[in-house]
């Protein structure tokens, strides 16, 4: 199984690395409009001695939704419990998380779009009235009890905002979408992370990594570590532009941040379907990847850089994508892999 170095999805081994996550809004790089909105909301809540309104973050994976949730709790001097939508199977699981929360604490639910309808319905009164209704027992003897909750704030994160029902979505007072980062912002992030991790890097080396990180800090930090491995084994231990370029080439990451899986999608559309339009399910079968993964993980960046178009008839590649696929360096990279 091939490792995808430019996947925005978190790798398990990355949990064990020293944290490069910022702890305060002032240290969070990029997403300026979101930081401004959160600064106003947090300052207002503090002055009013009230909990924050419930918050919903949306956007592609790897952009900092989880980091922002922890920063918000830190800025409010409050505790945060974290979980994810697929984990919350039973009402009792949710109650076990909500009942210990103290006034102005936080519950963060990642992949909140994957909550079951039953859990969503239990959250309605929890979000509005700070109570939850639980069914105790079975059959004729079953009864409903109401448990009071402290004033808490729910923070949800989703990559698929459209999958949340309107009644649930409307209960969030603050809804914010994170967008992909500019290369200049990612260069600052790479430089900052290198400093925290003790990795020697030049400004040109940081910019080279940033330019291939698909607008995603998680990918930038991952490529930084892999480039450092290469610098230690094949270089002098420091990452300059040449080392970064050579290391990323060896990892199969081209100048635009595309890997073999991205190029496979583009090549299937270009060569097998004459540039499109072609349906998502057909692409999925051709490249051997789930439709949802293609739509959530691959397509946002390909669309962002102008290589892919979504039309009512299906997906189409652009002339820019054809030019990129025809680039000699890209052809060499495909052969290398």
UniProtKB/Swiss-Prot annotation:
Main location: cytoplasm
Reaction catalysed by this enzyme: ATP + H2O = ADP + phosphate + H(+)
One function term, GO molecular function aspect: four-way junction helicase activity
Renumbered residue ranges of the record's region Head domain (RuvB-H): 255-337
Region ranges (Large ATPase domain (RuvB-L)): 1-181
Subunit structure: Homohexamer. Forms an RuvA(8)-RuvB(12)-Holliday junction (HJ) complex. HJ DNA is sandwiched between 2 RuvA tetramers; dsDNA enters through RuvA and exits via RuvB. An RuvB hexamer assembles on each DNA strand where it exits the tetramer. Each RuvB hexamer is contacted by two RuvA subunits (via domain III) on 2 adjacent RuvB subunits; this complex drives branch migration. In the full resolvosome a probable DNA-RuvA(4)-RuvB(12)-RuvC(2) complex forms which resolves the HJ.
Name of the featured protein: Holliday junction branch migration complex subunit RuvB
Species this chain originates from: Methanospirillum hungatei JF-1 (strain ATCC 27890 / DSM 864 / NBRC 100397 / JF-1)
